[in-house]
């Protein structure tokens, strides 16, 4: 499809269809816009790494809709560690200005029926996971569940070229990537929506040590 007619939808089902076909997708998250793809599609991940100018060794964050999707990953934690992670994903009782998205590095379990690809874990023996709070993206993750992706994972990284601030709206996301790839055949789809307005930046922690990475 021509980049003069960008892929834009308000349908989660359509957006999931694009992801399953290897499309990159920009979408609203808790605080900023994110951009992602099917984490089990190596070509799509490599395309995303290229436009983000991100080294593969760093790994990628994935989001899902429910802790129940990743029970096997949470089993690698002790009771206290697991409860800390689960509590961080419960935001209903938190004041809006204090809400924060929490991503955790979870150890890779040997019990996984579907292995997490090396192009997602990077140089690490863990995977960075967040149960996302955004209702639209929760629905998107649920649509991504399949035999090859039982976790409902979608890659999630900030929607911006390297060196630029993350997009805060659909129009900003479009300006970044329609301009950035005007001379290439790479095309980004867009899922209409608004961020949840979280004011605090997202946080990344190591679930085993409790160390805050970012």
Curated annotation (Swiss-Prot):
It comes from the Bacteria. Residues 9-214 form the YrdC-like domain. The keyword Nucleus does not apply. The keyword Heme does not apply. Gene3D superfamilies: DHBP synthase (3.90.870.10). It is found in: Cytoplasm. It holds the Pfam family Sua5_yciO_yrdC. One of its GO terms (molecular function) is L-threonylcarbamoyladenylate synthase. InterPro entries: DHBP_synth_RibB-like_a/b_dom, Sua5-like_dom, TC-AMP_synthase, TC-AMP_synthase_SUA5. One of its GO terms (biological process) is regulation of translational fidelity. It is an enzyme of class 2 (transferase). Its EC number is 2.7.7.87. GO terms for cellular component: cytoplasm. It catalyses: L-threonine + hydrogencarbonate + ATP = L-threonylcarbamoyladenylate + diphosphate + H2O. Keywords: ATP-binding, Cytoplasm, Nucleotide-binding, Nucleotidyltransferase, Transferase, tRNA processing. Required for the formation of a threonylcarbamoyl group on adenosine at position 37 (t(6)A37) in tRNAs that read codons beginning with adenine. Catalyzes the conversion of L-threonine, HCO(3)(-)/CO(2) and ATP to give threonylcarbamoyl-AMP (TC-AMP) as the acyladenylate intermediate, with the release of diphosphate. Belongs to the SUA5 family. TsaC subfamily. PANTHER family: SUA5, THREONYLCARBAMOYL-AMP SYNTHASE. HAMAP family: TsaC (MF_01852). This is Threonylcarbamoyl-AMP synthase. The gene is tsaC.
């Amino acid at each position: 499809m021509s980049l003069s007619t960008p892929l834009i939808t308000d349908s989660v089902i359509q957006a999931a269809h694009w992801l399953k076909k290897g499309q990159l997708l920009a979408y609203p998250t808790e605080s900023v816009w994110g951009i992602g793809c099917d984490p089990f599609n190596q070509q799509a991940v490599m395309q995303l790494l290229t436009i983000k100018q991100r080294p593969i060794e760093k790994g990628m964050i994935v989001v899902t809709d429910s802790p129940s999707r990743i029970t096997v990953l949470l089993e690698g934690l002790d009771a206290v560690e697991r409860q800390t992670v689960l509590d961080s994903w419960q935001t209903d009782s938190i004041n809006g200005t204090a809400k924060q998205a929490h991503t955790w590095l979870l150890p890779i379990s040997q019990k996984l029926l579907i292995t997490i690809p090396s192009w997602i874990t990077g140089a690490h023996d863990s995977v960075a996971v967040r149960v996302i709070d955004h209702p639209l993206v929760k629905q998107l993750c649920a649509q991504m569940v399949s035999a090859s992706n039982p976790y409902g994972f979608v890659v999630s990284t900030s929607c911006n070229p390297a060196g630029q601030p993350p997009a805060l709206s659909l129009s900003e996301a479009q300006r970044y990537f329609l301009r950035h790839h005007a001379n290439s055949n790479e095309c980004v789809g867009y899922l209409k929506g608004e961020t949840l307005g979280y004011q605090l930046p997202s946080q990344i922690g190591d679930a085993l040590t409790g160390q805050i990475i970012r």
